[in-house]
């Protein structure tokens, strides 16, 4: 992304009175200048007109002293929908009349996979393969992917954790398979945040959240706010950082982590060290030790010192650790704050949000809410990103509220029904409907078998 595009080119005042879709058009017109305004407007209409349960797309609501930016009203009930309803529109526009085809290879820790499968299902000229860590996503997340229909989709579980899956996908992009597919007229691409087209749509909801706060008289135009973001891969908070560089008034981005708190340690000490035990938590989408998007922020924090960033990333690959010091670290720490929560603290916040505030939140949102409420300086409003429906993680939310599992610890649908009965809230229709859908994808592969799986998927798709 061009440095020049990220220098105070948008101000909140320019977005006053706009709808979400109008705000998206303003942001995309700046960041995606290779597309015509008509292409962007038509893509935005297809992405956001009917796919979201809320007219606001990403509404902001109050929970206690904080605000929730609700990002889970899309077709798969996760924040990835905001980007992955738009990315297929962008890729289709780019491919139009070219005769080119694209094979997407995507790693997921839970939410990206289903959102990408849903967004790209049966899109002409595009095939998609999704890999997730075997046994390390929730029951509902698994079923969302395993039941996915579409003539151009393929799904496989991978033995290992998300870091194993993600690092292998990255290696595949630098492997002979990329050229092999290119020789057949197929471009290898990604729906992960390594694809900048995945991040750009997420910039929009930061600007739109601020607009909503101003219009609700919760913040004065131009006044700074905090955003607290639950993240493992640093992608969602990076989108906010892009918005900040474009002109959004932000005091701090608060990076909220689970027990895999490598980002907390880095922002506290300047040392990024992935040489630690991998912890399986009730926030599986954050069970990550290699935050692939951190590199992009470091580039700006180093004032574009590409040689330094290359050395840091080489150290991470070879030794599993790198260190940032001096003025660069101070620049980072002046904007990015941090905190983390273990599973017990996460469950406690789920209970607190329900009993005290009457809000049912998923575990990832609970991590961020807990960290936000521990801010040392609460003098400015704080927007907490609510990244998924609690019904995607109904077992863990139910146990957090009741203190015990159901008798026999049954499948996710029993917990979905029990959570609905306990709280009086209904699961989103796409999640509730999973129980009647057949499992279509049962493949389990080792990391070294992922390239062959993509090769076979491309042969079927095209």
Predicted segments, located by residue:
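PLP-dependent amino-acid enzyme catalytic core
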Residues: 2-462
């Amino acid at each position: 992304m061009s440095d020049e595009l990220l220098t105070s080119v948008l101000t909140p005042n320019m977005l006053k009175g706009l709808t979400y879709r109008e705000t998206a058009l303003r942001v995309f017109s700046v960041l995606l200048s290779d597309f015509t305004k008509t292409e962007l407007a038509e893509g935005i209409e297809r992405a956001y007109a009917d796919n979201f349960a809320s007219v606001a797309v990403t509404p902001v609501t109050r929970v206690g002293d904080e605000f929730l930016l609700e990002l889970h009203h899309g077709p798969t009930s996760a924040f990835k929908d905001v980007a992955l309803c738009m990315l297929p529109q962008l890729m289709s526009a780019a491919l139009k009349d070219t005769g080119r085809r694209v094979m997407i290879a995507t790693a997921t820790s839970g939410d990206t996979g289903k959102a990408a499968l849903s967004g790209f299902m049966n899109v002409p000229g595009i095939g998609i393969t999704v890999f997730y860590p075997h046994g390390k996503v929730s029951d509902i997340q698994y079923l969302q992917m395993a039941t996915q229909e579409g003539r151009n989709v393929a799904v496989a579980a991978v033995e290992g954790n998300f870091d194993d899956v993600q690092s292998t996908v990255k290696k595949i992009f630098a492997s002979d398979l990329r050229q092999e597919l290119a020789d057949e007229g197929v471009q290898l691409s990604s729906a992960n945040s390594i694809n900048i087209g995945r991040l750009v749509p997420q910039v929009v909801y930061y600007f739109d959240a601020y607009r909503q706060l101003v219009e609700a008289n919760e913040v004065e135009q131009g006044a700074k706010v905090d955003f607290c973001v639950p993240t493992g891969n640093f992608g969602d908070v990076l989108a906010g950082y892009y918005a900040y560089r474009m002109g959004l008034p932000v005091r701090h981005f608060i990076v909220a982590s689970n027990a895999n708190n490598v980002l907390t340690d880095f922002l506290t000490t300047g040392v990024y060290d992935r040489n630690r035990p991998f912890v399986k938590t009730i926030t599986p989408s954050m069970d990550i030790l290699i935050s692939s998007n951190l590199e992009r922020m470091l580039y700006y924090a180093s004032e574009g010192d590409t040689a330094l960033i290359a050395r840091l990333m080489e150290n991470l690959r070879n030794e599993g650790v790198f260190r940032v010091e001096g003025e660069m670290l101070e620049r980072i720490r002046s904007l990015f704050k941090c905190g983390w929560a273990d599973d017990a603290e996460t469950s406690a916040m789920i209970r607190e949000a329900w009993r005290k505030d009457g809000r049912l939140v998923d575990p990832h949102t609970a991590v961020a809410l807990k960290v936000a409420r521990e801010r040392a300086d609460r003098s400015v409003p704080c927007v907490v990103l609510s990244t998924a429906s609690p019904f995607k993680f109904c077992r863990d939310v139910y146990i957090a509220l009741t203190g015990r599992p159901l008798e026999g610890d049954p499948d996710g649908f029993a917990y979905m029904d029990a959570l609905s009965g306990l709280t009086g809230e209904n699961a989103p229709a796409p999640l509730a409907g999973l129980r009647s859908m057949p499992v279509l994808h049962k493949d389990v592969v080792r990391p070294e078998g992922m390239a062959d799986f993509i090769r076979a998927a491309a042969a079927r798709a095209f």
